[in-house]
Each structure stands twice: as structure tokens, then as C-alpha cells.
Amino acid sequence: MNLDIIDHSASKRIQNIKVKEKELEKLIFPFNKHSIQSLEYKPFSRFSLAKSIDDVFDGNLSKTLNKILKDRNTGVAIIEPDIKNSKFDKDFLVKLSTGLAYLVGLPNFDLMTDKYYARFYVKHSDSSDSYLRKAYRNLDLHT
């Protein structure tokens, strides 16, 4: 596998996973197929990112992450991408973290309705001070 996995200096339970720039560069093309907005509204886009990441690591990254997180002797993984280049912008990092989250489980899953949902923020436009209004709460759009 093209990953360096080492124990963290603070605890052996924390595993540092270092992802090399060479592997990150392989993700630029598949990540460019999806906009941040498509990640919010299209569940398949999120799964596609996860598949692209796992393919770069020959299907071993998802197994490794799940093994670390489910093992009582470890349980924590810190992923450190080797980013020395400006082509890895904040959108790339959002896509990387979204894909990594989907390798581990099913984020944005509503168990009550058994559906995935996109999350978006609502800008506060009401100037009243009613405690009933919670302007900065997330609204969920079920798909």
C-alpha cells in the first residue's frame, strides 16, 4: 500500500496515516468531475469520490481505515495529506475529506427515513429576537 502508517507521538491508539503527494495527484482528475454543489445535492457524487480514493490505494484504504477505527487498541486515525503544492486548494480538501468519510461509513444518513440528505445553510434575515427562530441551524433536504 502507498501509505505510511505510524503511531502518533502522544498515544499508540492514534494512528497517523501519511498520504503522499504522488497519490493525491492521481485524484485531481476524478475530483474535478464533481463540484462542491454536486456533493451537497447528489449522493452518488460522494460515493464516486470515495471510490476514486480507494482505487488509488488498490482498495486497501477503506479496509485499513475501518480496521483502525474498529480496533479497541487503536480507534483513531489522523490522515495527513502531503500538500506542498497550490493545486491542492480548499475545494480539493473538502472533496478528499468527503471521500474519506464515505470510505468509513455513511455520513448524512437519516435512519428514521432511511434516506441520504444534503445539508445547506440558511442565511439569517429576520431581525426579531424570538427564541423560536434559530437562524443558523442546518436544514436538511432529503433525496
Segments predicted by a language model, with ranges:
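Non-heme Fe(II) oxygenase catalytic core, chiefly the N-lobe of the double-stranded beta-helix
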Residues: 2-143
